[in-house]
Every structure is written in structure tokens, then in C-alpha cells.
């Protein structure tokens, strides 16, 4: 496992962070703890609690108790709570503070290294909620405040200077919007976490062909002359690279971005976890970076057209 500095926090974070989400939490406390332990054995020291299931916090605390707390980096998603019909969005100060205190009580972690607001809209986060989070930080209950999302409100939140961390989608298909947002975060010395690094539209050759075929059909109707770039680029090579899966390529590409401290990985499958943790120590095959850039260029050209 490789490790990277995390913004201005002074923390050294593993290149991969295990997300403890609903899928693994539904399998019970013992299996959740076993997966966290497996991640620890692979050298992962970052863990993100994404689920509101109480058993998840219990399991994470149980598994992490074997290591010194200072060697670990544990974060919590905020902005969702349990309602009568399931999860509901809730960025009220009461909900945020309750989520933090419940997680700390169940996990016995002492403090959370990071709390992350999950994709808040521009008018969705009251000022008093931000004040409540700052009070938790002042009290030593949390260390860093972060914001995650892909909507345009992220730019407004970054401009406030109130946050230490940006969690953002970043993949082989990401464009200038994501890159500019990451650059703005770097200029503020923020830590950057990446997620959604394997876009759904790329997870099978059939999906890639469907999307790219639709684009070829659309642009063929716009132009009378043949497109000089037709047949060049495209992402089908992701599923034709020897000794690499498309998922592994996409993860490895995201980790080539120097601004990204860690990529979130979410799986309940121990075998898949074993596969993913091997990626940070691998180098992309020669020429693959150029293929990715050509595919990005072709996709960007089609969107601009």
C-alpha cells in the first residue's frame, strides 16, 4: 500500500480508503468487522462510515481497536438520517451533532478525523449547522470538516474557506469542471478524496458501445462530411487490456492524479477487496495513458459539438 500526505492536516493517508456502506452493514456486525480487519492487514488506514446503520459504527470500532488511534483516519458521512420511510436528507445542526455523537459512542473511537457533508445544495446548509460543526471541532470531537458532491454548489462551499477537505468524483471521463474544482481546493491546501472513479457507463463493453454508438449516430446527422476523428479514441480498450480489468485501470488512473490523497473503495466482497488493494502498487501499461487522453479528447470534442 502507498501513502500520501493529506492536505494541511499533517496526516499520512493510505492511497485507498475503505467505505463502510449499507451493503456491508446489512451483512451484520461480524462480517463488517472482518472486512475492516482485512483492509487493515492490507495496509489501509483510512475508513469512511457512509451508512446510518448503528452496527457499522460498532463493527468499525471493534476492528480498529487493535491499532493505536493516531495511526488511523476515520471519517463519517453527514446529511442523512433515519426517517419513518427510510433515509431522509437532514442538514440541521441537531441531526449533524446527533450523528457524530452516536458514532463516537458506538465506536469508542474518541474522535472523528473528518466529517463530510454529503452533496448539500446551495441553500441546504444553514449557517447554524456550520457553526455547530465548528463547535464540534473546537471541542475535539472532530478534527476536519469536509464537503462532498458534484453539483455547482461545491464551488460556493469551497469559496467560503470553511472546509478542510473536498471529496469529489474523479475518473477517466472527468473534464475541466472537476479539474478546476480540484485545483481550487489545492490552492487552499485542502485534502482531496476521490470517488465514483469507475463510471457505470464504462463497466461493460456493451455499455461503452451503446453510448459511443449513440454519439456517432447523432453527430453523423449533424455533419455532411465524414468525421476525420471517427474510429479514433473511445473507451473500449478498457476491456481489452491484458492482465488488467477495466475497474483496475480506472482506479489506477485516478491514483495518478497528484492532488488525490486517497480514493474511496466500496465493496462487501473480500475477494474484490484483495483485487483492489493491489492496484496502487501497479503502474499503468505503457501507452495506456495516451489512450485515455485520446478517449477524453474525443468525448470532449463530441460534447462541444
Placement of each model-derived feature along the sequence:
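N-terminal binding-site loop/beta-alpha segment at the start of enzyme catalytic domains
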Residues: 1-73
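Conserved, mostly hydrophobic/aromatic
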Residues: 6, 18, 47, 60, ...
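Short, well-ordered coil/turn segments that N-cap beta-strands
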Residues: 11-16, 43-45, 68-72, 109-113, ...
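Active-site mouth loops of central-metabolism enzymes
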Residues: 17-30, 81-97, 238-241
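Active-site beta-loop-alpha junctions enriched in small/polar residues
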Residues: 21-23, 50-52, 77-81, 117-120, ...
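Glycine/proline-rich, positively charged
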Residues: 27, 88-176, 180, 256
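Structured C-terminal cap/extension of enzyme domains
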Residues: 38, 45-48, 64, 180-305
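Structural motif corresponding to the early beta-alpha repeats
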Residues: 66-94, 118-119
Amino acid at each position: 500500500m502507498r501513502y500520501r500526505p493529506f492536505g494541511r492536516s499533517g496526516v499520512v493517508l493510505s492511497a485507498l480508503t475503505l467505505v463502510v456502506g449499507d451493503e456491508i452493514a446489512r451483512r451484520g456486525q461480524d462480517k463488517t468487522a472482518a472486512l475492516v480487519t482485512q483492509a487493515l492487514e492490507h495496509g489501509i488506514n483510512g475508513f469512511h462510515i457512509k451508512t446510518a446503520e448503528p452496527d457499522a459504527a460498532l463493527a468499525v470500532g471493534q476492528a480498529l481497536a487493535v491499532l493505536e488511534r493516531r495511526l488511523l483516519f476515520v471519517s463519517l458521512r453527514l446529511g442523512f438520517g433515519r426517517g419513518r420511510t427510510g433515509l431522509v436528507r437532514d442538514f440541521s445542526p441537531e441531526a449533524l451533532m446527533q450523528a457524530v455523537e452516536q458514532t463516537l459512542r458506538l465506536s469508542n473511537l474518541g474522535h472523528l478525523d473528518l466529517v463530510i457533508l454529503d452533496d448539500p445544495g446551495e441553500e441546504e446548509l444553514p449557517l447554524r449547522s456550520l457553526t455547530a460543526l465548528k463547535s464540534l471541532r473546537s471541542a475535539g470531537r472532530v478534527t476536519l470538516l469536509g464537503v462532498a458532491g458534484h453539483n455547482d454548489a461545491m464551488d460556493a462551499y469551497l469559496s467560503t474557506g470553511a472546509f478542510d477537505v473536498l471529496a469529489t468524483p474523479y475518473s477517466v471521463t472527468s473534464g475541466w469542471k472537476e479539474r478546476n474544482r480540484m485545483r481550487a481546493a489545492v490552492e487552499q491546501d485542502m485534502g482531496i478524496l476521490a470517488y465514483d472513479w469507475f463510471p457505470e457507463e464504462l463497466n461493460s463493453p456493451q455499455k461503452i458501445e451503446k453510448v459511443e454508438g449513440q454519439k456517432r449516430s447523432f453527430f453523423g446527422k449533424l455533419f455532411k462530411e465524414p468525421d476525420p476523428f471517427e474510429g479514433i479514441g473511445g473507451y473500449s480498450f478498457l476491456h481489452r487490456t491484458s492482465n488488467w480489468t477495466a475497474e483496475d485501470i480506472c482506479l489506477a488512473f485516478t491514483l495518478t492524479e497528484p492532488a488525490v490523497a486517497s480514493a474511496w473503495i466500496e465493496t462487501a466482497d473480500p475477494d474484490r477487496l484483495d483485487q483492489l488493494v493491489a492496484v496502487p502498487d501497479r503502474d499503468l501499461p505503457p501507452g495506456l495513458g495516451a489512450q485515455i487522453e485520446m478517449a477524453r479528447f474525443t468525448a470532449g470534442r463530441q460534447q462541444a459539438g
